[in-house]
Amino acid sequence: MSTTTAGILFALSLALALAAVHVPLGDYMYRVYASEKHWRAERVAYRIIGADPAAEQGWGSYARSVLAFSAVSILFLFGLQLLQGRLPLHLNDPATEMTPALAWNTAVSFVTNTNWQAYSGESTQGHLVQMAGLSVQNFVSAAVGMAVAMAFVRGLARRDTGELGNFWVDLIRGSLRILLPLSIIGAIILVSGGVIQNFALHDTVVSTLSGAQQTIPGGPVASQEAIKELGTNGGGFFNANSAHPFENPTTWTNWVEIFLLSCIAFSLPRTFGRMVGSRKQGAAILAVMAVIATLSLSLMMLFQSQTHGTVPTAVGSATEGVEQRFGVADSAVFADLTTLTSTGAVDSFHDSYTSLGGLMTLFNMQLGEVAPGGVGSGLYSMLVLAVITVFVAGLMVGRTPEYLGKKITPREIKLAATYFLVTPLIVLIGTAVAMALPGQRDGMLNTGPHGLSEVLYAFTSAGNNNGSAFAGLSVNTEWYNTALGLAMVFGRFLPIILVLALAGSFARQGRTPESVGTLPTHRPQFVGMVTGVTLILVALTFLPVLALGPLAEGLH
């Protein structure tokens, strides 16, 4: 069996597994967020934080709760990192100094669900920071995205009200009822597959084949690895991330990790369909995600199987930066889905991909990570694109556009259009400023088109809250730590504010009855329109800079 055939079978098995859990997991998440009962542990949490679970919030109050919780989380994680040398389970001789700029960048990164890492995890962060800081944020940052998605869906489903639910209820339920039990199951599976789970620091010394002594770092890896993937976080315990054999030792664990990073995002459309009272609407959104993901994965595997240069031609594929235990095809599947979602974990190194393979990782993020996107963020991003599509279709036939019985007035389309413009502006302005400053260009280890691609990738990853990187860019500097931190903050919270404002606007409307001129939003025609609008908008926005970077490199 050829490696390409094996890779196709690998991808098909993942698709079948995701299809199998789509309905039960989507229905379970619907029951979690629709339930009127509170667990005892949840009631304790409400009392601790002083929240009234029976109180509904409008979009402004919901947004303020999101921002307040995230701000406190950033401050806590920032302080924990700077003080870790005085706390238990710290590293005695960290390889990288934890400066305020790096602590800021890391705190923002994990709170925004980006998990961009400008440091080597196993030689910089102690176990207490990994467990009480980074792992906790892996849970709650994912739960925040899911909460915002549920608030937006309620805005579409409800009428004549300004209430979108309760952020604190959504946050705690998402963490305790969905992410925690699934991550426990995932961690047990990963441990059984060989992922380590211990409290060893840097005190395990072994003899190498040549007789030298080597220190092997350990830690509670499996427990962090499960939520790292499940919550589409992506920050690795080790610098090599999921390419490290302690995080991802076999093809089986590789398959499990890809499944974990995809399952919630691909199941949320089912939850959406149940909440709006039409499973067909959820199926249509899922179909858009599946079409884009299939196109992207096909191109990624094609480009990574291309052979340019003496060594790739002799080997038969582009193997640089690829772990041989996974192979090119399986690594391409991981790379594609980690950038289609907001995960950013890697089992191979994207900077070593072919120019067009690297282009696909960039383009996937520039889509807004909507196919399926991050947990929660992918769903609300796709629904905003659906709103834009309905508006465009309404212009074509000369009717007031409607989506799920809600009219799209000038206020709604302004919010949706602004939502779409935020991230491209962050990415393009950040890249332009970095390229214009001579001091920042010194951090580029490559010149020419690939050097531009590395800077573009950094700001694309930060602005879209992905976290993966083209590693040929030295980013642990005060400027990059600050600039990329700001890109992560604005790229996370400006879209959240806009999507909650849009949800509040929809919730205040009544329901408009369907008429002969209403565009059906559950048919293949609509699926094709949303797919087309998504691809065209992204192509028009980013094609010029992609032409200067990976496309120019590919032509060269």
UniProtKB/Swiss-Prot annotation:
GO cellular component: plasma membrane
The organism's place on the tree of life at top rank: Bacteria
Subcellular location: Cell membrane
GO molecular function terms noted in the UniProt entry: P-type potassium transmembrane transporter activity; potassium ion binding
Keyword terms: Cell membrane, Ion transport, Membrane, Potassium, Potassium transport, Transmembrane, Transmembrane helix, Transport
Family: Belongs to the KdpA family.
Summary of the function given for this chain in its UniProt record: Part of the high-affinity ATP-driven potassium transport (or Kdp) system, which catalyzes the hydrolysis of ATP coupled with the electrogenic transport of potassium into the cytoplasm. This subunit binds the extracellular potassium ions and delivers the ions to the membrane domain of KdpB through an intramembrane tunnel.
Protein name: Potassium-transporting ATPase potassium-binding subunit
Source organism per UniProt: Mycobacterium sp. (strain KMS)
